[in-house]
Regions:
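Short amphipathic alpha-helical segments and their helix-coil junctions
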Residues: 1-2, 19-33, 155, 201-211
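Nuclease catalytic cores
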Residues: 5-60, 120-121
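Metal-dependent nuclease catalytic regions and adjoining charged, substrate-binding loops involved
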Residues: 7, 180-221, 225-336
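Short catalytic/ligand-binding loop motif for oxyanion handling, primarily in non-cytosolic enzymes
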Residues: 23-24, 32-33, 162-167, 249-253
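Hydrophobic (often cysteine-bearing) scaffold residues that line and stabilize catalytic clefts
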Residues: 39, 43, 86, 220-223
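A non-catalytic, helix-rich entry segment at domain boundaries
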Residues: 46-128
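Non-catalytic protein-protein interaction segments used by genome-maintenance enzymes to assemble
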Residues: 121-222
Length: 336
């Protein structure tokens, strides 16, 4: 059994969803190969490359850091089999995001930053918990982080939802503003906040004070909270998490219609403390070994199950004609 050096929002999500898959990916002696990137994954990665390269050039100047050149980001994030498709469709998402006004709103926030905003940094942090000697090591890759001139501590992320869906994807509740990112007649919600949003200017940023982020989406909350802790926010403290959610509906053409819902929220202290305890429990279990992984079993049964999982990919051969089929069909999926 391997022992992980850190936990991440992704691994914590897998632990919750499917303990068997967590063991295979992060702990098994014979690690499974990565599942190939789908188009649903690739569209978010492609848009990410377009928007970050644009923002970095606008703020720091062209060529300031080769890491943030479009080609570098795109090829690092989009797998080869998706690149032709993702190049076109990522441009569509970025152009829609820019033209509707969402990008300008983001630039206004970034222009109010105290010092330079931080982009796309992979960082680790040690979080203290009373049950864990030496603390818990967390890893994250925040899209953007800044502290504005009013002292607001902000972590920013993008989500592209429903791009490959045949049906319309609705935005999450509570957004502070939504843009129709298409040239047809706009809906009556264009430029307005959600009906359940109670908007207030707090430390220079309009946030929804009627909903915490955990009321909007648990996965988003966990991800941005962990990022905030790693970046220096205290567990239980007040910080702002910002998500621009791009949702899609079919147009009858190659490119879907898009809308951008802007979510700006806090994360409650009770939720942070609960998440903190949950992560400490996961960390304790994976460090304790096989007997603590499957908590619905006795320690002996848990060890036996882990021993079996260690062997699942022992004889896997990358070049076998059925290898890709075996990898996909023997794994847990969340995007089908």
């Amino acid at each position: 059994m391997r022992t992980p050096d850190y936990l991440s929002p992704t691994s914590i999500g897998v632990w919750r969803r499917d303990r068997r898959e967590f063991y295979l990916i992060y702990l098994a002696d014979n690690r499974p190969p990565r599942i190939p990137q789908t188009q649903a994954m690739a569209i978010g990665a492609a848009f990410d490359a377009y928007v970050k390269s644009h923002l970095h050039e606008r703020i720091f100047g062209k060529g300031a850091n080769p890491v943030f050149e479009f080609t570098t980001l795109f090829e690092a994030q989009v797998e080869k089999h998706n690149r032709d498709w993702a190049m076109r469709h990522g441009a569509h998402v970025f152009n829609s995001y820019r033209d509707c006004g969402a990008l300008s709103d983001l630039m206004l926030d970034l222009n109010d930053a105290e010092g330079e905003p931080q982009f796309e940094m992979q960082i680790t942090g040690r979080i203290v918990h009373s049950s864990c000697i030496g603390g818990i090591i967390l890893l994250g890759k925040p899209d953007i982080h800044f502290i504005n001139k009013s002292g607001a501590f902000v972590v920013y992320d993008w989500k592209v939802n429903g791009y490959m869906s045949a049906s319309t994807t609705s935005p999450k509740k509570g957004y502070v503003k939504i843009y129709d990112a298409f040239t047809l007649t706009h809906s009556n919600q264009h430029g307005k906040s959600h009906k359940d949003c109670q908007m207030m200017l707090v430390d220079g940023i309009y946030i929804n004070i009627a909903h915490y982020m955990e009321d909007v989406d648990q996965g988003w909350t966990d991800q941005t909270t962990i990022y905030s802790w790693i970046l220096g926010a205290e567990v239980g403290s007040k910080f702002t998490v910002a998500i621009d959610q791009i949702v899609c509906k079919g147009s009858g053409n190659e490119f879907p219609y898009l809308r951008v819902a802007m979510h700006r929220n806090r994360v409650s202290e009770p939720y942070q403390l609960k998440l903190h305890d949950e992560i400490a429990d996961i960390w304790t279990r994976v460090k304790a070994g096989k007997s603590r992984i499957f908590d619905e079993m006795t320690p002996e049964e848990s060890v036996k199950k882990c021993d079996v999982l260690d062997l699942v990919f022992k004889s896997y051969q990358d070049d076998h004609k059925y290898s890709d089929w075996f990898n996909v069909m023997s794994r847990s999926h969340s995007d089908f």
